[in-house]
Regions:
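C-terminal transmembrane-helix exit sites in multi-pass transporters
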Residues: 106-124
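Hydrophobic/aromatic residues within transmembrane alpha-helices
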Residues: 26, 35, 88, 114-116
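Helix-helix packing/entry segments at the starts of transmembrane helices
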Residues: 34-41, 83, 89-109
Length: 144
């Protein structure tokens, strides 16, 4: 069960849901960029502690330049995403911000097809369309 991608994806979704709630509460009284920096520091320490307890330190030296570059770019994209997300949480309701943030799924599907040459089928198109529709329905606030 712990070797299943679905198990890990569901755990990720659960933790991401908690993240939105904790972040909304945490960003209430401070600058959103400072809140992001604090969160990032916690993530850095926490993930290094886990990685170093499970992976030999010597394996870090074996990482290729290409891998470092791609992970570095991923880190920059993550940082930019978090900065935007925390600002959105500071300005909006979690129940509206989180669905829009999850449009990242649609962007990832499209980019996977364009950059990674993954083949998309009708399920990707239908699912992506439903995600967009769902995000818009959840984020839309009718005029009072």
């Amino acid at each position: 069960m712990l070797n299943s991608w679905l198990t890990w994806a569901l755990l990720s979704a659960r933790f991401a849901g908690l993240t939105a709630i904790f972040a909304k509460i945490g960003v209430a009284d401070i600058n959103s960029h400072l809140a992001t920096a604090i969160r990032t520091t916690v993530v850095l320490v926490f993930t290094w502690a886990i990685a170093l307890s499970l992976v030999p330190l010597a394996s870090v030296a074996a990482i290729s330049r290409h891998t470092w570059l791609m992970l570095g770019l991923s880190g920059v994209a993550t940082g930019l995403s978090w900065l935007c997300y925390f600002r959105a949480l500071q300005l909006g309701e979690v129940s509206r911000v989180a669905p829009i943030d999850k449009l990242s799924v649609v962007f990832a599907i499209v980019l996977a097809a364009v950059i990674l040459r993954e083949r998309l089928n009708w399920q990707h198109w239908l699912g992506g369309s439903l995600i967009v529709a769902g995000a818009l329905v959840l984020a839309w606030k009718p005029a009072a």
